[in-house]
């Protein structure tokens, strides 16, 4: 027999490539339009809100199929947490002309979720400050957003999805405020970062991150996100172009806080204090972590409702890949898991 914290074979899902998703989760052809935020064409109801973290204004985005109506069943809430180099909309509501559906907000709104995301301090439409927007700052951002989401939706617990440093933000928030987290998806996550090629390369700039609160984020840097792991064929070049076209309207500087944290302060999350059900999802070519590092974290999670999924032919940016439909399928299966029967 195995203990609750041991790694059972049934817990580790190596997702095969064919036939995983169809219908709403399939990649559909899109009409040619200018790149930027996903065009809704009246299909969705959207809203924006502002949270305050002291003097810092934080922009929050919401999308669902229809406007909220009195007496309707309360929809499940999915909150998406962005990473180090892109703000919320280019991460989760991107339109790539003629290339199919890339907007997670669209995908999950169609699946019946009330979908939310936010720009962290120093990103997108949120306040630019003298700070470096590190992981701890991101947790405070989420704490500021949660009361607004609860008030507008009637729910006090939400599903969270975070990718890359967004996964660290989401996990750290789940550790700090477990009563607000229903199910948690950690995508392209990093625990201790041991033997991770991307972090080894990034650490060469550690002194810069220690002495500067912003870093250059130009078109070449954005493109490198999709090529640095040695599998550029996993991505359509139009994705990097669409992200750059959208993001560079906010300038060429990004906060250094998450880079500093990931190169000098890991681990930032204690897995034994993450109490919610957890899905850990990664691409098989992702250089931000290793299987050994992530399985170390996974094996310490106290909740037996957990999954570890590796997607083939995917590098760091899972939900921007050609195989993103596989990720959407796995995420939906996890979020819609029926309640367990107590024994």
What is the predicted role of each segment?
Residues 36-70:
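N-terminal cap/lid segment of alpha/beta-hydrolase-fold proteins
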Residues 140-156:
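Conserved acidic catalytic loop of the alpha/beta-hydrolase fold
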Residues 314-324:
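Catalytic histidine-centered segment of alpha/beta-hydrolase-like enzymes
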Residues 167-178:
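Short glycine-enriched nucleophile-adjacent loop
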Residues 287-293:
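Conserved alpha/beta-hydrolase "acid-adjacent" motif
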């Amino acid at each position: 027999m195995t203990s609750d914290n041991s790694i059972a074979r049934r817990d580790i899902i190596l997702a095969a490539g064919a036939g995983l998703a169809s219908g709403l989760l399939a990649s559909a052809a899109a009409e040619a339009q200018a790149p930027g935020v996903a065009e809704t064409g009246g299909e969705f109801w959207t809203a924006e809100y502002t949270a305050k973290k002291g003097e810092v204004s934080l922009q929050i985005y919401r999308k669902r199929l229809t406007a909220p109506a009195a007496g309707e069943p309360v929809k499940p809430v999915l909150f998406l947490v962005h990473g180090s180099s892109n703000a919320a909309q280019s991460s989760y509501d991107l339109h790539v002309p003629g290339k199919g559906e890339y907007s997670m907000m669209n995908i999950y709104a169609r699946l019946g979720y009330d979908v939310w995301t936010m720009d962290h301090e120093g990103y997108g439409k949120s306040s630019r400050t003298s700070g470096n927007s590190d992981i701890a700052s991101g947790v405070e951002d989420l704490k500021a957003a949660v009361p607004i989401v609860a008030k507008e939706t009637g729910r006090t617990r939400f599903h969270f999805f975070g990718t890359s440093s967004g996964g660290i933000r989401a996990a750290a928030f789940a550790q700090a405020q477990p009563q607000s987290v229903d199910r948690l998806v950690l995508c392209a996550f990093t625990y201790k970062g041991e033997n991770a090629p991307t972090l080894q390369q990034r650490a060469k700039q550690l002194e810069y991150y220690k002495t500067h609160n912003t870093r250059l984020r130009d078109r070449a840097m954005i493109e490198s996100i999709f090529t640095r792991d040695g599998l550029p064929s996993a991505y359509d070049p139009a994705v990097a172009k669409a992200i750059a076209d959208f993001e560079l309207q906010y300038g060429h500087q990004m906060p250094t806080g998450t880079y500093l944290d990931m190169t000098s302060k890991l681990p930032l999350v204690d897995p034994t204090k993450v109490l919610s059900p957890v899905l850990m999802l990664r691409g098989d070519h992702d250089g931000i972590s290793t299987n050994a590092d992530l399985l170390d974290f996974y094996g310490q999670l106290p909740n037996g409702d957990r999954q570890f999924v590796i997607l083939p032919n995917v590098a760091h940016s899972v939900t921007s890949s050609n195989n993103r439909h596989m990720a959407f399928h796995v995420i939906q299966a996890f979020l819609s898991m029926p309640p367990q029967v107590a024994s």
